[in-house]
A protein has these predicted regions:
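Extracytoplasmic metal-acquisition and chelation regions
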Residues: 2-14, 20-307
Length: 307
């Protein structure tokens, strides 16, 4: 894949991996000299701002490539950048360091764009995966609502549903237009173009997964609830909402049994989290592993590629 590939192509790679598995039958843009200064908490939100704002906006991604966004700690300079920004795009409850910087800065409502106010959040205890009551062999319903997997909160991974990304795009267009009315037409045009690409992506997912016989996807952590809900899949996360929340021995045995019973052939890992437990499940069941990115951030190897 060429460097600087499109957002659509960048996100379609996980689509291809899902189809193969289920079977069938911290950089910023600084070209703007005097445009709005935007601090985005991590990569997906920074990318939306870049697509809408283009060269008319100065965007800072607060999460550097290779950094697990769940574990973000801000440097003093970044805290100052948040507090001096014309707009901060973030999601409350996802990155505590960003939440704290926003609160300490006493930013006005006009300076804040909280994505949690833009889209409907899923409850973390169901994680969008068990909404239809997925029954497995022997009448056992697989669930991760116990022993650390029930976080009593919401699932923050909203960006993995293209429909949510479209809503976020509209919100960014509106806020940037309020800040810089002279560029409003440009922001609107760019936002419309980006949403068209998101629509193409959604169509690709729906058509590609329509004949998928195995609807379970075993993932490193519970990042894919929105994807699963949107496309009628059942997420089976090894870890919880936080990648570091590893399963208990009983939960791991449950997942391993499920992989065997349902004939799941692929266990998905990701770039920014340890694959150790997923590798164990794959080894014990004869499944293969593949990377399914939750698109939480770029790595050093992919820093020059796009979403």
């Amino acid at each position: 894949m060429k460097k600087k590939s499109s957002a659509l192509l960048g996100v379609m790679l996980p689509t291809a991996l899902l189809l193969a598995a289920c079977g069938s039958g911290g950089t910023g843009s600084s070209d703007a000299d005097s445009g709005p200064r935007v601090a985005a908490s991590f990569y997906p939100f920074a990318y939306v701002v870049e697509q809408v704002g283009g060269t008319a906006v100065d965007v800072e991604n607060l999460t550097s490539p290779g950094t697990e966004p769940h574990d973000l700690e801000l440097k003093p300079r970044q805290v100052a950048d948040v507090q001096d920004a014309d707009l901060v795009v973030y999601e409350t409850g996802f990155q505590a360091a960003v939440d704290e910087a926003v609160e300490q800065g006493d930013l006005s409502e006009d300076q804040r764009l909280d994505v949690a106010d833009v889209v409907t959040l899923l409850d973390a205890s169901e994680d969008g995966a068990e909404s239809d009551g997925h029954d497995h062999a022997e009448g056992e319903e697989h669930s991760h609502d116990e022993e650390g997997h029930d976080h009593g909160s919401t699932d923050p991974h909203v960006w993995l549903d293209p429909a949510n990304m479209a809503k976020i795009t509209d919100a960014v267009v509106e806020r940037l237009s309020d800040i810089d009315p002279d560029q409003a037409a440009t922001f609107e045009k760019n936002g419309t173009a980006f949403k068209a690409r998101l629509t193409e992506l959604d169509t690709s997912f729906r058509q590609g997964l329509a004949q998928c016989e195995t609807r379970d996807i075993v993932t490193s952590h519970a990042a894919f609830g929105y994807l699963a809900k949107a496309y009628d899949l059942t997420q089976v996360p090894i870890a919880g909402i936080e990648p570091g929340n590893e399963p208990t021995a009983a939960q791991l045995a449950d997942i391993t049994r499920l992989v065997r019973q349902d004939g799941i052939t692929t266990v998905f890992t990701e770039e920014l989290a340890s694959p150790a437990v997923a590798d164990t499940v794959a080894s014990e069941t004869g499944a293969t592993t593949a990377t399914l990115s939750p698109i939480e951030g770029l790595t050093d190897d992919t820093a020059d590629e796009t979403y």
